Each structure stands twice: as structure tokens, then as C-alpha cells.
């Protein structure tokens, strides 16, 4: 239904920690509503958002929205479509209407923790391919502020020696404190620059 609505939201969180945006849509019990009130649990879509929507195995952001006459707790954020981000919310004070403006403020400590763990999955993947061989492919992942899970394919159980070598190499890279930069590229540009892409894998 949402995919046919034409609603779009732009993620601005790579270069902004907070943002002011217009509320495009409020959904309660799977229906569009004009307004929501204290105690309501709703989904909110805004024109722009600094909230990261769950995708690629990384958990979505939590935080708050606030505006004239309302405060909202953002419990979770999802990204069901590439250009659509949905905030799962609870109205904690006042009432909010479609077209209202809101300040969107993610929990930055949680965001940074999730980013660290997301980066760690890439480090681990690179080390696994170096230690075990280039056949190793990411088969799934879960990245959250408190930790991460990384699933991969290999033809045998890992020996204690291999596990220790992998841990040592990962820790060595972390201790180098290499600066991490976010660069948004077109697909072919990313592949040409050496990025690994296993898009036939679903997880």
C-alpha cells in the first residue's frame, strides 16, 4: 500500500545528527489518520530524517521527535523501501497532526555504537577472507548497539588456531584507529573501487 502511495523520505543522517522536517503521514492501526494523541502508538513518515532505518542487517535508530504541542518517543525505525523510512513511535505528550513540523533527534550514543559494530562486520569479513580464503562470503548479519552477529560460509569448522588468528588480526586493525569515511557512490563506482557485493544473498 505504501509502495503505491508515492510517499518518499530522504535520509540525511550521514551529514546531520538532527533535522527539522515536515510530517507527511501518520499511520495508526494500518490506516492513515489526520492526528495522533498522547498514548497512541503510530508510524510516522517525514520528508527528511536523520534516523537510520533498519536495513542491511543494522538495527534502526531510536530517539525522539518534538514540536509545538507534542513530544514523541521513536521506538524503532524501519526502511521497507529504498526511499521510504518509517518511524515507529509512541506519543508521550500532546497531539501531532500531518503537516506539523518536528525536530527529529536520534539517540546518538546508540547510533555510534551500532556504527562501530557495523564497521566491525566489514573488518571481520576482510580478515576471514584473508585467513580462510576468498571463498568466504557474508551470508547474513545482525548489527545492533550492543553487539553484532556475522554469518558466513566455510567448508569446515574453524580450529582454535584459526579463531585466535582471526581475533588477533581484527583487534590489530581496530587498534590502528583508521579513520572511517562515508562515501555515497553509484553501484558501478563502488564495484570499480573494490567494494564487495553479494546482492544475490538474501538476509
What are these regions (language model features)?
Residues 1-203:
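A glycine- and charged-residue-rich anion-binding loop/surface
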Amino acid at each position: 500500500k505504501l509502495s503505491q502511495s508515492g510517499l518518499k523520505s530522504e535520509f540525511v543522517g550521514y551529514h546531520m545528527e538532527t533535522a527539522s522536517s515536515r510530517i507527511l503521514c501518520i499511520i495508526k492501526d494500518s490506516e492513515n489518520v489526520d492526528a495522533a494523541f498522547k498514548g497512541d502508538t503510530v508510524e510516522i513518515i517525514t520528508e527528511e530524517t536523520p534516523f537510520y532505518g533498519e536495513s542491511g542487517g543494522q538495527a534502526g535508530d531510536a530517539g525522539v521527535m518534538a514540536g509545538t504541542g507534542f513530544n514523541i518517543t521513536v521506538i524503532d525505525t524501519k526502511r521497507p523501501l529504498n526511499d521510504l523510512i518509517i518511524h515507529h513511535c509512541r506519543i508521550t505528550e500532546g497531539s501531532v497532526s500531518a503537516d506539523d513540523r518536528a525536530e527529529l533527534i536520534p539517540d546518538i550514543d546508540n547510533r555510534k555504537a551500532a556504527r562501530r559494530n557495523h564497521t566491525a562486520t566489514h573488518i571481520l569479513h576482510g580478515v576471514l577472507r584473508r585467513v580462510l580464503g576468498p571463498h568466504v562470503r557474508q551470508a547474513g548479519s545482525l548489527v545492533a548497539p550492543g553487539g553484532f552477529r556475522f554469518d558466513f560460509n566455510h567448508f569446515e569448522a574453524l580450529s582454535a588456531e584459526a579463531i585466535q588468528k582471526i581475533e588477533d588480526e581484527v583487534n590489530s586493525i581496530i587498534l590502528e584507529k583508521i579513520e572511517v569515511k562515508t562515501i555515497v557512490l553509484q553501484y558501478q563506482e563502488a564495484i570499480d573501487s573494490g567494494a564487495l557485493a553479494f546482492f544475490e544473498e538474501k538476509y
